[in-house]
């Protein structure tokens, strides 16, 4: 046994089944009115009954306004209704859309019988319905030349799609000749083969006035058409068999014209929107370009070109001066560095030696002068000068030797060397070298 369901869920399920039943969406019900009451809102509530059953019915004010008689209790009527359920009470009731006094019941019976037959034959199936063309070039109209339907359709087409051509087939839309003329016009439109979509219809009326569009000859012509057909018969509450067989049903002739040009109108609006956007974009670009040109025209440079050239020359002269000053400053710095490097060799110690030797020479010269003859003194002086020259740093350098200085101090042996750069003094200049390895004696090697 399935799980129990709440009452509201059962009611919703039953209502959904009723609403989904195509036959119950619009059915003509014959019965006698009882308990009729019209409220101030305009809505009418009553019961339809026969000898065996009764059903609650409601007719809303928008439909009640179309009544051509005043309903009363005991009156026998035919009510075109939708069968549904009122969820609050769970009552199955009729939503009456159209109601007429009985007397034309045979027409409704024929209508309902033929409707069931066509539905069983599949003539109402959505699968067989043809789609409307997106951009029709020619629209065919089958209607009366005297009614308002033609004016409404043509006016709407010209307003929404003025480039679309119209082919009009004038026919009678009620009376004995209406059905054969409408069917013949539909076939003629198909023989032309230049129409992209057909609108078949007329304005509203009674069931007798609309009956031509329930006749088999018209229904069969619509079914056989290779051109998509929009049925626009009567008002929104009027339904004919032509409406069910046609590819699309329109509530009014004006609505039919709108459906025929729906995509055209949408594309037109898109084009207008894009055109406005493009216009705004172009105007914005033009305004920006105009402003830029005006700024250039009003700039001081264009108004006074001599002043602009003078400014350029002044900036060039300043750049030239800065370049010359920079070169001089660089040359001064280089000269100073060169002097510092040339003075890095430590000659103070040799200067002291030379001074001491000079004093000794002078002393010896004085002694020789006093104690020896001049020739012997001269010889000794020459010998001393030779010895002095032998120990002179310049003499050492002239024989191919060099002096090494590191961090401003004279290097006398390998162990004094440290990692980094050293200055090597030659007879004719100096060089900078990097100490990478120390070798003490013949065997000991020290990596820096």
From Swiss-Prot:
Asked if the record carries the keyword GTP-binding, the reply is no
Quaternary context = Heterooligomer composed of large and small subunits.
GO molecular function (one): exodeoxyribonuclease VII activity
Protein family according to the UniProt entry: Belongs to the XseA family.
Q: Name one GO cellular component term.
A: cytoplasm
User: What's the superkingdom here?
Assistant: Bacteria
Which InterPro entries does the protein's record reference?
Exonuc_VII_L, Exonuc_VII_lsu_C, OB-fold_nuc-bd_dom
- EC identifiers of the protein: 3.1.11.6
Q: Which UniProt keywords apply?
A: Cytoplasm, Exonuclease, Hydrolase, Nuclease
Q: What is this protein called?
A: Exodeoxyribonuclease 7 large subunit
Instruction: List the HAMAP family.
Output: Exonuc_7_L
- What is this protein's function per UniProt? Bidirectionally degrades single-stranded DNA into large acid-insoluble oligonucleotides, which are then degraded further into small acid-soluble oligonucleotides.
The signal peptide, as residue positions, is none
Instruction: State its location(s).
Output: Cytoplasm
In its UniProt record, which GO terms are filed under biological process? Answer: DNA catabolic process
User: Which chemical reaction does it catalyze?
Assistant: Exonucleolytic cleavage in either 5'- to 3'- or 3'- to 5'-direction to yield nucleoside 5'-phosphates
User: Which Pfam families does the entry link to?
Assistant: Exonuc_VII_L, tRNA_anti_2
What's the source species for this entry?
Answer: Exiguobacterium sp. (strain ATCC BAA-1283 / AT1b)
Mostly located where? cytoplasm
């Amino acid at each position: 046994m399935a799980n129990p369901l709440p009452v509201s869920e059962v009611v919703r399920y039953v209502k959904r089944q009723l609403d989904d039943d195509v036959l119950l969406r619009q059915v003509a019900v014959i019965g006698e009115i009882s308990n009729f009451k019209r409220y101030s809102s305009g809505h009418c509530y009553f019961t339809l009954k026969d000898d065996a059953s009764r059903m609650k019915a409601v007719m809303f004010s928008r439909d009640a306004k179309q009544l051509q008689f005043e309903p009363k209790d005991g009156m026998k009527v035919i009510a075109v209704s939708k069968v549904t359920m009122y969820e609050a009470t769970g009552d199955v009731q009729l939503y009456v859309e159209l109601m007429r006094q009985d007397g034309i019941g045979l027409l409704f019976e024929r209508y309902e019988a033929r409707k069931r037959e066509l539905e069983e034959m599949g003539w109402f199936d959505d699968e067989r319905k043809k789609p409307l063309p997106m951009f029709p070039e020619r629209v065919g109209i089958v209607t009366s030349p005297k009614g308002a339907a033609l004016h409404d359709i043509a006016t709407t087409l010209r307003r929404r799609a003025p480039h679309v051509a119209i082919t009009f087939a004038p026919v009678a839309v009620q009376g004995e000749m209406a059905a054969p003329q409408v069917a013949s016009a539909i076939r003629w439109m198909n023989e032309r083969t230049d129409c992209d979509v057909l609108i078949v219809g007329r304005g509203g009326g009674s069931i007798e006035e609309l009956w031509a569009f329930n006749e088999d000859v018209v229904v069969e012509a619509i079914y056989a058409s290779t051109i998509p057909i929009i049925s626009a018969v009567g008002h929104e509450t009027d339904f004919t068999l032509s409406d069910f067989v046609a590819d699309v049903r329109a509530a009014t002739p004006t609505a039919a014209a709108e459906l025929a040009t729906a995509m055209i109108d949408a594309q037109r609006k898109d084009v207008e929107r894009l055109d406005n956007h493009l216009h705004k974009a172009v105007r914005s670009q033009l305004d920006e370009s105009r402003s830029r040109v005006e700024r250039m025209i009003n700039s001081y440079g264009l108004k006074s070109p001599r002043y602009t050239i003078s400014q350029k020359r002044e900036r060039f002269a300043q750049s030239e001066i800065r370049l010359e000053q920079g070169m001089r400053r660089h040359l001064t710095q280089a000269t100073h560095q060169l002097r510092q490097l040339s003075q890095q060799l430590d000659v103070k110690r040799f200067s002291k030696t030379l001074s001491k030797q000079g004093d000794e020479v002078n002393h010896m010269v004085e002694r020789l002068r006093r104690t020896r003859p001049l020739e012997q003194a001269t010889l000794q002086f020459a010998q001393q000068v030779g010895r002095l020259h032998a120990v002179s740093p310049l003499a050492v350098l002239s024989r191919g030797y060099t002096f090494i200085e590191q961090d401003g101090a004279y290097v006398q042996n390998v162990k004094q060397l440290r990692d980094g750069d050293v200055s090597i003094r030659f007879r004719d200049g100096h060089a900078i070298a990097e100490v990478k390895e120390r070798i003490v004696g013949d065997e000991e090697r020290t990596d820096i």
